[in-house]
Curated annotation (Swiss-Prot):
InterPro entries: KsgA/Erm, rRNA_Ade_diMease-like_C, rRNA_Ade_Mease_Trfase_CS, rRNA_Ade_methylase_Trfase_N, rRNA_adenine_dimethylase, SAM-dependent_MTases_sf. Its EC number is 2.1.1.182. This is Ribosomal RNA small subunit methyltransferase A. S-adenosyl-L-methionine binds at H21, L23, G48, E70, D95, N115. It comes from Prochlorococcus marinus (strain NATL1A). NCBIfam families: ksgA (TIGR00755). The lineage of its organism: Bacteria, Bacillati, Cyanobacteriota, Cyanophyceae, Synechococcales. The keyword Methyltransferase applies. Specifically dimethylates two adjacent adenosines (A1518 and A1519) in the loop of a conserved hairpin near the 3'-end of 16S rRNA in the 30S particle. May play a critical role in biogenesis of 30S subunits. It is an enzyme of class 2 (transferase). Belongs to the class I-like SAM-binding methyltransferase superfamily. rRNA adenine N(6)-methyltransferase family. RsmA subfamily. PROSITE patterns: RRNA_A_DIMETH, SAM_RNA_A_N6_MT. Gene3D superfamilies: Ribosomal RNA adenine dimethylase-like, domain 2, Vaccinia Virus protein VP39.
Amino acid sequence: MGGDNTLNDFRHIPRKRFGQHWLKDQGVLDQIVKAAELNPEDCVLEVGPGKGALTEKLIESQAKFIQAIELDRDLVIGLKKRFNHQNKFSLREGDILSAPLDAENGVTINKVVANIPYNITGPLLKRLIGELRKAPENSFETLVLLMQKEVAQRLLARPGNSNFSALSVRVQLLAKCQDVCDVPSKCFQPAPKVDSKVVMIKPFASIDPDFYEVGNLLEKLLKHAFAGRRKKLRNTIGSFVTSNDQIKEFFAYRGISLDQRPQEISPSNWFGLAKALKETCVIENGTFQSK
């Protein structure tokens, strides 16, 4: 990340392998900080501070403490020169996919702000909010993430929308997602080939006790169904629905039709179906079979 003045201060060529694009639009930077709703008790994890434009705004905010993680050693040197005199700031050199997510001074981090490199969006989301089969390492209250617009649209999509996908189901079962703003490619230096979007994610404070028990089955179910997202359910999972009375009852109770497509089924109904399947089916050779 970086603002106009900061961009000029750092003599650093963006590295493609790190997915580096400096955010230079001050209006977008302000919207990110506003969306984080920072107060004097908040401790923020900033992912990929880059050249420090957003870092500066976070330090100026009411937040109690900022812990940043940066992978590029050259940028780490510049960031330390610029911010190490700040008592409320600490910088850790490392890969966000493996580095500790706690603050170096021992405070508990409750919010995350990140400009996500496009090539690690999926793995980073799993680490920050968890996945169907595994709870997250840390519990965060709010995440404000800048990501590729196409991915953001999938996180935000509702059932029936053309962007609704297996990713939509996975994330919406774990958190509430809210659109913050669009970020055209011209807001970055260098400009990426695609536009971006800022999304606010609020992980649910409590998860259904059965959630992680059926997570593995639900993951396989989504993979199976959305592999043919244009196909009706009767052509993807219909064989075990029509042969299983309990599953047929579930479909009837929830008002689900086999003539619907996978993107028309709500996250809660996918979860409910997985719970019903756990009691009545097993997976053999990649297909669902009645017990």
